């Protein structure tokens, strides 16, 4: 089983993330940021990843530290769970629509962190959630999971739909990249022979 639990404590946040990459999509979230919980549930369900996230943060200031640090901790847990990456597909991609919105996410479990994020939300906030924090979440994830991630919202005029298509596509792309490829059994999917340097 490809599982990991990571706890990260700072003066700003206390976070524990547990995940199972070979799960059934069960999500449990206690972060104090309801819309982020809703989005992470999309990752779990569409990625078929069992994901448990508990966070206490300085929400009396705003959600910035909590959202960013959850991304960091999720990235650390993912890197631990995926291991040496032998026998996996490595690359994943997904297009996901929701009514008028359409997003594309492409991921490479390359060992090199990089985020290309092209999203123009039609509103600055979804409820009380500042949409700028999604970029912080994905930056945190990418920098600590050591993956290359391209996120493009291709169209949409409802910000909730824009965000939801991104997170659903991210879950599906992640699922594809993590899948075992029987023809690559025991082989690292790189001409370098490694994805860790």
From Swiss-Prot:
Principal EC category: lyase
Pathway of action: Amino-acid biosynthesis; L-histidine biosynthesis; L-histidine from 5-phospho-alpha-D-ribose 1-diphosphate: step 6/9
Lyase as UniProt keyword: yes
Annotated keywords: Amino-acid biosynthesis, Cytoplasm, Histidine biosynthesis, Lyase
Pfam families from the UniProt entry: IGPD
Superkingdom of source: Bacteria
Reactions catalysed, as given in the entry: D-erythro-1-(imidazol-4-yl)glycerol 3-phosphate = 3-(imidazol-4-yl)-2-oxopropyl phosphate + H2O
Main location: cytoplasm
Protein's cellular compartments: Cytoplasm
GO biological process: L-histidine biosynthetic process
Molecular functions (GO terms): imidazoleglycerol-phosphate dehydratase activity
Annotated PANTHER family: IMIDAZOLEGLYCEROL-PHOSPHATE DEHYDRATASE (PTHR23133:SF2), IMIDAZOLEGLYCEROL-PHOSPHATE DEHYDRATASE HIS7 (PTHR23133)
HAMAP family per UniProt: HisB
NCBIfam families, alphabetized: PRK00951.1-1, PRK00951.1-5, PRK00951.2-1, PRK00951.2-4
Homology family: Belongs to the imidazoleglycerol-phosphate dehydratase family.
Protein name per the record: Imidazoleglycerol-phosphate dehydratase
Organism: Chromobacterium violaceum (strain ATCC 12472 / DSM 30191 / JCM 1249 / CCUG 213 / NBRC 12614 / NCIMB 9131 / NCTC 9757 / MK)
Taxonomic lineage from the root: Bacteria, Pseudomonadati, Pseudomonadota, Betaproteobacteria, Neisseriales
Gene for this chain: hisB
